[in-house]
């Protein structure tokens, strides 16, 4: 976890944290750093960064649940970026992501392992069990999550979410 009060990492980059920044949840600490680098070049700011590693104790779903249950519309970031290697509890992800979106949040996510090569890479990295790509697509669509396929796309979509709505 990294936020305005705690930086529990040993590598760079460590971004400056801002209350109005993006919440970022990653299934991989190393991949999180690559995504942070991409985001910083676009001027994207962070409110918090969470890495759940191989999700043996908690996964992306539990962090989303925590954010949903404790959401403060005045103080909390309304933009969430997710890098997911496996979805262990799709119902939990659907419920809490949908709830956050109804509360005014925007969520963009990469689901790693959408190709055969990607499935092997995710499995060898964290032991992730591959989810069906069509099931992931349906889950994201139903929840309202914007699906991305690269770190550049993820950080670009999150950057777009930060723009003020044109009326």
Question: What would you call each of these model-derived segments?
Answer:
Residues 1-167:
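Catalytic-core regions of core metabolic enzymes
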């Amino acid at each position: 976890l990294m936020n305005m009060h705690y930086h529990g990492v040993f590598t760079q980059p460590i971004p400056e944290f801002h209350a109005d920044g993006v919440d970022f949840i990653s299934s991989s600490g190393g991949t999180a750093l690559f995504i942070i680098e991409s985001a910083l070049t676009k001027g994207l700011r962070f409110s918090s960064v969470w890495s759940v590693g191989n999700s043996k104790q908690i996964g992306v779903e539990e962090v989303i649940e925590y954010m949903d249950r404790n959401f403060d519309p005045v103080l909390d970031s309304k933009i969430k970026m997710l890098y997911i290697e496996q979805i262990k509890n799709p119902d939990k992800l659907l419920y809490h992501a949908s709830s956050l979106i109804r509360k005014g949040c925007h969520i963009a996510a990469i689901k790693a392992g959408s190709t055969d090569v990607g499935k092997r890479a995710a499995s060898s990295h964290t032991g992730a069990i591959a989810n069906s790509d069509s099931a992931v697509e349906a889950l994201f669509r139903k929840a309202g999550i914007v699906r991305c396929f690269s770190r550049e796309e993820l950080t670009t979509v999150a950057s777009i979410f930060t723009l003020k709505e044109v009326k």
